[in-house]
C-alpha cells in the first residue's frame, strides 16, 4: 500500500512540474514543406514577481523588464532554429531578429503589441511565409539586466521557477495556425534565455513539421 501511495505521489508531482500540449494542423507537413522563410517575433511576456519584489519597481520598470525579456527570448529562439538548421533538421531561412524588428518599426508597428495584427499583415511586411509568435509567463526573469537587479535586491533566486510558454506558428498566406506548442514547467529552467528555450523546446523538435 505504501509503495502504491508513493508511486501515485511521484506521478502527481511529475505531472504538476511539466505539462505539454502540441497541436499540429492536419496539413502541417504540406505547410512546412512550402515554407521558405520564417520570422521569429518577440513573445508577449509577463513576469510575475512576488509582492516583495514588485514593491521595489515602478510600473514603467516592470514593463521595460518584460520587453527586455521578450527580445532576449526572441534571440534565443532564433539561435535554437539556427542550431536545428546546422544539424540538417531544418531547411527554411530564418530572418534575424534585428531585421524583423527593424522592418516592423519602419512600418510603425510596436513589436511588443503584435497581437493587434494578422499574421498575413506581418508576413507581408516581413516578406516571410511563416511567423512564430505567442506568449510567455515566468516567475523569474532571464534577461541579464533584470537578473542582476533582482539579485542585488533580494539575493539569488531559488531553484524552483515557473514558466508557461505558448508558441504559435502561423502560415502568412492564409493566417492558418499550423502549430501550437504549449508547455508549463516548474523547476530549474536554466540560468539565461537560451538555457530556458532549450529546456522548453526539448523533445518536441521531431514532432514539429518545420523541424523534424
PLM features per residue range, with description:
Residues 3, 97, 136-139:
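Histidine- and/or cysteine-centered catalytic micro-motif in compact active-site loops
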Residues 3-14:
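Sec-dependent N-terminal signal peptides
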Residues 10-12, 32, 86, 159:
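A generic structural signal for short, solvent-exposed coil/turn residues
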Residues 19-49, 125, 136-147, 154-212:
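C-terminal/domain-edge helix-coil "capping" segments
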Residues 44-46, 50-133, 172-183, 203, ...:
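N-terminal segment of the mature soluble domain
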Residues 62-71, 153-163:
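Glycine-rich, flexible loop segments associated with nucleotide phosphate handling
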Residues 116, 151-152:
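Charged helix-capping and loop-helix junction motifs
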Amino acid at each position: 500500500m505504501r509503495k502504491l501511495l508513493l508511486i501515485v505521489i511521484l506521478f502527481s508531482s511529475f505531472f504538476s512540474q511539466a505539462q505539454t500540449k502540441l497541436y499540429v494542423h492536419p496539413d502541417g507537413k504540406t505547410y512546412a514543406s512550402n515554407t521558405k522563410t520564417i520570422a521569429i517575433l518577440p513573445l508577449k511576456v509577463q513576469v510575475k514577481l512576488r509582492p516583495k519584489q514588485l514593491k521595489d519597481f515602478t510600473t514603467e520598470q516592470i514593463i521595460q523588464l518584460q520587453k527586455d525579456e521578450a527580445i532576449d527570448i526572441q534571440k534565443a529562439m532564433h539561435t535554437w532554429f539556427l542550431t536545428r538548421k546546422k544539424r540538417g533538421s531544418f531547411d527554411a531561412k530564418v530572418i534575424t531578429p534585428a531585421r524583423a524588428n527593424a522592418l516592423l518599426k519602419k512600418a510603425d508597428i510596436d513589436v511588443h503589441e503584435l497581437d493587434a495584427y494578422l499574421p498575413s499583415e506581418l508576413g507581408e511586411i516581413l516578406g516571410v511565409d511563416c511567423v512564430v509568435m505567442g506568449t510567455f509567463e515566468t516567475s523569474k526573469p532571464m534577461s541579464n539586466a533584470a537578473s542582476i537587479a533582482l539579485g542585488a535586491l533580494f539575493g539569488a533566486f531559488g531553484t524552483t521557477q515557473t514558466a508557461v510558454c505558448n508558441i504559435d506558428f502561423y502560415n502568412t498566406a492564409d493566417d492558418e495556425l499550423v502549430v501550437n506548442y504549449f508547455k508549463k514547467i516548474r523547476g530549474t529552467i536554466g540560468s539565461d534565455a537560451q538555457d530556458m528555450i532549450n529546456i522548453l523546446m526539448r523533445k518536441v523538435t521531431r514532432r514539429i513539421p518545420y523541424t523534424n
